[in-house]
Design a protein with these regions (language model features):
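Cytoplasmic helix-loop-helix junction between adjacent transmembrane helices
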Residues: 129-166
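Helix-breaking motifs and short loop linkers at transmembrane-helix boundaries and internal kinks
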Residues: 66, 98, 119-125, 136, ...
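Glycine-rich segments within core transmembrane alpha-helices of 12-TM secondary carriers
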Residues: 158-183, 187, 204-205
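Central mid-sequence intracellular linker of multi-pass
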Residues: 164, 190-251
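Residue-level signature of mid-helix packing/kink "hotspots" within the transmembrane helices
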Residues: 52, 80-88, 138, 172-173
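Conserved MFS/SLC helix-loop-helix module at the cytosolic interface between two early adjacent transmembrane helices
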Residues: 85-124
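Cytosolic juxtamembrane N-terminal segment immediately preceding the first transmembrane helix
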Residues: 2-52
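Extracytoplasmic
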Residues: 35-69, 175-179
Length: 264
């Protein structure tokens, strides 16, 4: 077992951890943000885009396929119902087969399902395809949040999560602009604008899913882009997290028991 005391200050204060980092610890944390958060941010953009693009597609898709607002509402409901139901099973699979394999697999599958929506011919095919997107995409967000706990010490985890989640408002803001431009391609190569929308916003998830296989690692111990010293340093920080989570409560209780004035 590694000796965490060599890399962690003797009087460690979690609230001021960022001020107590050694140069190596800061270097490791910076590597994690550059390698993981930037890439995961891009993944989440396309994940969120595949959720909301049906709203943009509905502007013209309804007229072409004879769909009304109720049908689009049901398609949205079916997506979120399957998304909620399959979230936990998907995370279980992630822990069984590994983050890299599972995230890559579900990205490719939901990318295919989202892209295939361009071939929808009516309400039933739309319902089925949106359910498939919900099933396959369900494990992505909770899976990534779990994945980040494998890499980031507790103090930096909130920042990592926040930077990753910024993709949601960014996608919402830019999605309407990009989707509006894609819809203007209506008639190109005899495809409707909404067909181009599902193709150009869905297929990138397939390509990114393939990239996940080569870019992500299941754990720090398997990361070739971290040196042996980096891995040791990160493990010491993670070990210290567990110590600070366990020790303070017991330490305070022990200290309180020793203060006789409290019991007078």
């Amino acid at each position: 077992m590694s000796d965490t005391s060599s890399a962690i200050p003797e009087k460690f204060d979690p609230a001021n951890q960022h001020k107590q980092l050694t140069a190596q610890q800061q270097s490791v944390i910076n590597k994690l943000f550059r390698r993981l958060i930037v890439f995961l941010f891009v993944l989440f953009i396309f994940s969120f885009l595949d959720r909301i693009n049906i709203g943009f597609a509905g502007l013209t898709m309804g007229q072409d396929l004879g769909l009304n607002a109720t049908m689009f509402g049901l398609a949205t409901t079916l997506f979120y119902a399957t998304y909620v139901i399959f979230g936990i099973p998907s995370n279980v699979m992630l822990s069984i087969v590994g983050a890299r394999r599972w995230i890559a697999t579900i990205m490719v599958l939901w990318g295919i399902a989202s892209t295939a929506t361009m071939f929808a011919t009516g309400p039933n095919s739309l319902y089925i395809l949106r359910m498939l997107v919900g099933i396959t995409e369900a494990g992505f967000l909770p899976g990534i949040l779990l994945y980040l706990t494998y890499w980031f010490p507790a103090f930096f985890r909130a920042r990592a999560n926040a930077l990753f989640m910024i993709a949601m408002p960014v996608t919402t803001a830019l999605g309407s602009i990009v989707s509006g431009y894609i819809l203007s391609m209506d008639g190109l190569l005899n495809l409707h604008g909404w067909q181009w929308l599902f193709l150009l916003e869905g297929f990138p998830s397939v390509l990114l899913g393939i990239m996940v296989w080569f870019w992500l690692d299941d754990s720090p111990s398997k990361a070739k882009w971290l040196t042996a010293d980096d891995k040791k340093c990160l493990q010491e920080m993670m070990d210290n997290d567990r110590l600070t989570l366990v020790q303070p409560e017991g330490a305070i209780s022990h200290h309180a028991m020793q203060q006789r004035s409290l019991w007078r």
